[in-house]
């Protein structure tokens, strides 16, 4: 029953940032909130930020941010099954609560979007994932979960020119989905990779299909990117926050105004 919040500012064409689709990937939220803190301060003080006068830049851009798509999953990952209320017993029965990526019902939100979902579901079953689990169970139907429905509804009700899904980890940027390659998406991805030092990549196996980025690209034929922040093992430690942020802040700003 936790709320999924969104904040927005600016005027003009809309860009979407969405974080923490997975329980252990809460550092994505902190990186983007750190970015917003510095960005909004630069706007309020009419300062330059990464060489850009941000006050002027947001006269024709609106940034919409969903800091935590999966608040229940994040709480379970950090605080255990007891934080899940009525779902506590079922989560304990599933196990691995400290390695929890799914939502409170054991559905992986980034396997629950309607893009290549049937093929992904067949692959899940082939890999023995056929019931609620800590990760990679895509549910019984696309958009079966309140989190995926909320994100899909948000996108259907807003004309976003591009979208970004922040995950961890691997220092990679995913930009296409199958045969769907929106105009300028590759060029934009190459610019983001150059600014961040991350690698443009294509997912494989159980990482293909069902994801928010996949769905956005297929549904709207507009650029969308998965940004895999940092390197290591999830959950990334909070001590990584400043290093990741400093490396990404220019890329984050350019991703909005480009």
Model-derived features: positions:
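Extracytoplasmic/secreted envelope proteins and their assembly/folding machinery
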Residues: 33-36, 148, 152, 189, ...
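Soluble metallo-hydrolase cores and metallopeptidase-like ectodomains found primarily
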Residues: 2-13
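Active-site/substrate-binding loop(s) of hydrolase catalytic cores
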Residues: 27, 40-178, 182, 190
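Short HxH-centered metal-ligating active-site micro-motif
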Residues: 17-30, 67-69
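Alpha-helical scaffolding within the catalytic cores
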Residues: 1, 50-51, 207-214
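Short, flexible loop segments at boundaries between secondary-structure elements
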Residues: 189-205
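Active-site-adjacent mobile loop/cap segments within catalytic or ligand-binding domains
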Residues: 151, 157, 162-165, 171-183, ...
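Conserved beta-strand elements of the Class I
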Residues: 14-17, 225
């Amino acid at each position: 029953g936790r709320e999924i919040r969104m904040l927005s500012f600016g005027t003009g064409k809309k860009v979407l940032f969405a974080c923490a689709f997975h329980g252990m990937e809460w550092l994505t939220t902190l990186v983007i909130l750190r970015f917003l803190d510095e960005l909004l301060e630069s706007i309020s003080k009419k300062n330059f930020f990464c060489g850009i006068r941000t006050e002027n830049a947001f006269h024709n851009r609106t940034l919409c941010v969903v800091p935590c798509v999966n608040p229940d999953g994040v709480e379970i990952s950090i605080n255990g099954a007891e934080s899940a209320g009525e779902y506590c017993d079922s989560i304990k029965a599933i196990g691995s609560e400290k390695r929890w990526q799914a939502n409170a019902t054991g559905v992986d939100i980034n396997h629950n979007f309607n893009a290549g979902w049937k093929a992904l579901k067949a692959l899940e079953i082939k890999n023995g994932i056929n019931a609620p689990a800590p990760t990679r169970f895509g549910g019984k139907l696309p958009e079966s979960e309140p989190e995926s429905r909320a994100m899909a509804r948000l996108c259907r009700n807003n004309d976003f020119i591009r979208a970004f899904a922040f995950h961890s980890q691997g220092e990679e940027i995913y930009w296409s989905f199958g045969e769907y390659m929106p105009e300028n998406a590759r060029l934009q991805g190459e610019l983001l990779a150059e600014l961040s030092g991350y690698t443009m990549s294509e997912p494989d196996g159980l990482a293909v299909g069902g994801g928010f980025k996949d769905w956005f690209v297929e549904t709207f034929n507009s650029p969308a990117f998965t940004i895999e922040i940092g390197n290591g093992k999830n959950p990334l430690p909070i001590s990584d926050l400043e290093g990741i942020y400093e490396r990404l802040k220019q890329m984050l700003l350019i991703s909005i105004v480009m």
